[in-house]
């Protein structure tokens, strides 16, 4: 697929001004030149032209907001002054795997004041013994060359890689709706866990109350049983006492009757 056709498909019914990221990797650049890319892409921040067969960047339009440009695995041998003229905001440039042989071909990059990272892996220029020292001296604005700083410390991913399309935060400070949905889901999960914990605590409280009631019920039954036993025992004692009282009364009556008969007999003797 040629570059023009690819750009048309990538637009997806959008206007060029609405595009912030454009990936044209592996499409065909006729005559080794950039085609179909115009200065209407005023908000483009990331452009990738990996392995498209470019010989030069002389047809690159002005892209005032472009920050990252991927040009690796092409056949570019010079003409980098075009980059300095058209890409004032460029911070990351990847020229790995091109036909750059001399340090002098990099001199136009001195005018890219914002350039922080440059990659030249696989270019013949890297074969020089003093390659790194020379490039850092030529381009003092650079922080990283081939992924390492002047002290040979590897660059953090956040410095080497720049997201081409940085999504703007919404009014709530969220990058997009996805983060917000994830937070909502996490909040729901936490609420469900809290509800489950609350239900478990309620169940435990109910079980404790039931156990307390059972214990109290048993104590009440024991008290009632004790009272009944005591009452029964007292009842038996009372009955025995009543029987004894009746026997005593009968004895007294019989004793009284005996005395009466004796008096009557004595009286009869006196009469005789």
UniProtKB/Swiss-Prot annotation:
Segments of skewed composition (Acidic residues): 149-254
Nuclear localization signal, short sequence motif: residues: 260-263
Matching InterPro entries: AN32, Leu-rich_rpt, LRR_dom_sf, U2A'_phosphoprotein32A_C
GO BP field: inner ear development; negative regulation of apoptotic process; negative regulation of cell differentiation; nucleosome assembly; positive regulation of cell population proliferation; positive regulation of G1/S transition of mitotic cell cycle; positive regulation of protein export from nucleus; regulation of apoptotic process
Residue stretches making up the LRRCT domain: 123-161
Any one GO CC term of the record: nucleolus
Composition bias type Basic and acidic residues, residue spans: 255-265
Keywords linked to the UniProt accession: Chaperone, Leucine-rich repeat, Nucleus, Phosphoprotein, Repeat
Domain of life: Eukaryota
Residue ranges, annotated region (Disordered): 149-272
Record PTM Phosphothreonine, positions in chain: 265
Post-translational modification: Some glutamate residues are glycylated by TTLL8. This modification occurs exclusively on glutamate residues and results in a glycine chain on the gamma-carboxyl group.
The UniProt record lists the keyword Repeat: yes
Modified-residue entries (Phosphoserine), positions: 164, 171
Tissues of expression: Predominantly expressed in brain. Expressed in the entire embryonic brain, whereas in the adult brain its expression is restricted to the subventricular zone where there are neural progenitor cells.
LRR repeat start and end residues: 16-40, 43-64, 65-84, 89-110
Expression induction or repression: Expressed specifically during the late G1 and S phases.
Compartments where found: Nucleus
Record-level Gene Ontology MF annotations: histone binding; RNA polymerase binding
Subunit description: Interacts with histones H3 and H4. Interacts with KLF5; this interaction induces promoter region-specific histone incorporation and inhibition of histone acetylation by ANP32B.
The family this protein is said to belong to: Belongs to the ANP32 family.
Entry text on domains: Histone binding is mediated by the concave surface of the LRR region.
Function of the protein: Multifunctional protein that is involved in the regulation of many processes including cell proliferation, apoptosis, cell cycle progression or transcription. Regulates the proliferation of neuronal stem cells, differentiation of leukemic cells and progression from G1 to S phase of the cell cycle. As negative regulator of caspase-3-dependent apoptosis, may act as an antagonist of ANP32A in regulating tissue homeostasis. Exhibits histone chaperone properties, able to recruit histones to certain promoters, thus regulating the transcription of specific genes.
Annotated protein name in UniProt: Acidic leucine-rich nuclear phosphoprotein 32 family member B
Organism, scientific name: Rattus norvegicus (Rat)
Name of the gene encoding the protein in the UniProt record: Anp32b
């Amino acid at each position: 697929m040629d570059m023009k056709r690819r750009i048309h498909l990538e637009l997806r019914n959008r206007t060029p001004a609405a595009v912030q990221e454009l990936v044209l990797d592996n499409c065909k650049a006729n005559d080794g030149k950039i085609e179909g890319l115009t200065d209407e892409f005023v908000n483009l921040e990331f452009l990738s032209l990996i392995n498209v067969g470019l010989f030069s960047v002389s047809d690159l339009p002005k892209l005032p907001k472009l920050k990252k440009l991927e040009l690796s695995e092409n056949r570019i041998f010079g003409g980098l002054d075009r980059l300095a003229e058209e890409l004032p905001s460029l911070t990351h440039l990847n020229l790995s795997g091109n036909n750059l042989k001399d340090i002098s071909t990099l001199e136009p990059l001195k005018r890219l004041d914002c350039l922080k990272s440059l990659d030249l892996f696989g270019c013949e220029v890297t074969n020089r013994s003093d390659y790194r020292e020379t490039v850092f001296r030529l381009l003092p604005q650079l922080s990283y060359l081939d992924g390492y700083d002047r002290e040979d410390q590897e660059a953090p991913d956040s410095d080497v890689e720049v997201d081409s399309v940085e999504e703007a935060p919404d009014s709530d400070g969220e990058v997009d709706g996805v983060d917000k949905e994830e937070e909502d889901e996490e909040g729901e999960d936490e609420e469900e866990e809290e509800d489950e914990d609350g239900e478990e605590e309620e169940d435990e409280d109910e079980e404790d109350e039931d156990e307390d009631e059972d214990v109290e019920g048993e104590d009440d039954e024991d008290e009632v049983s004790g009272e009944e036993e005591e009452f029964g025992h007292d009842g038996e004692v009372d009955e025995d006492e009543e029987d004894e009282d009746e026997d005593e009364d009968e004895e007294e009556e019989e004793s009284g009757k005996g005395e009466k008969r004796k008096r009557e007999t004595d009286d009869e003797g006196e009469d005789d």
